[in-house]
């Protein structure tokens, strides 16, 4: 799919409290940290916080059309499913909702980086197996740039999480930003290649 852009200029973080900056001042929200880090690396990219604390994949789907309505959006980081998992929502339902969000973004010619989640064994081994498989299956089916686990290097590390043990603190947010930035750089290069080939 051709993307008519010379570079990524606007990124939307489309997720839940794990990307929304829950419990942190605005300057330490993931959107702020990621935008600053990208600028320091030479990328003039605006990062929009389109995440909503408490959002399930169903809630994300309900707001996807208007949240992604800005024609200037080049890329979304899709990171939802944690609240589905906490509520025991069936993985098939989560997968269906995420796939619909992916399709909405594709129709709008928005690039997608899919950030995966990993379930604990709270709801049983079968639930964990089915849930964990959602993200690699969707990334393969739709040929998406893929971050296997959004909280890689952060989850279960007390020094990188707030007192609730769930939401990243300032240092944890920096780590997540680094993980996402690597994938954005790949997507940036991909868009540049598309533009060069087109012209």
Predicted regions and their residues:
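Short, amphipathic alpha-helical "lid/cap" segments that border enzyme active or binding sites
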Residues: 61, 95, 170-181
């Amino acid at each position: 799919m051709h993307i008519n852009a010379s570079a990524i200029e606007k990124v939307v973080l489309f997720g839940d409290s794990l990307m929304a900056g829950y419990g942190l001042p605005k300057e330490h929200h993931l959107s702020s940290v990621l935008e600053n880090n990208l600028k320091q690396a030479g990328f003039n990219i605006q990062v929009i916080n389109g995440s909503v604390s408490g959002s399930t994949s169903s809630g994300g789907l309900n707001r996807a059309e208007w949240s992604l309505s800005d024609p200037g959006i080049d890329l979304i980081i899709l990171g939802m499913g944690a609240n589905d998992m906490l509520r025991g929502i069936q993985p098939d339902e989560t997968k269906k909702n995420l796939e619909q969000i992916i399709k909405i973004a594709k129709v709008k010619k928005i690039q997608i980086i899919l950030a995966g989640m990993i379930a604990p064994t709270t709801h049983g081994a079968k639930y964990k197996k089915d849930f964990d498989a959602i993200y690699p299956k969707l990334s393969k089916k739709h040929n998406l740039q893929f971050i296997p686990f959004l909280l890689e290097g952060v989850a279960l590390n007390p020094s990188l999480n707030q007192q609730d043990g769930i939401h990243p603190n300032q240092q944890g947010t920096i780590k997540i930003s680094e993980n996402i930035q690597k994938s954005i750089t790949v997507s940036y290069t991909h868009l540049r290649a598309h533009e060069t080939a087109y012209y």
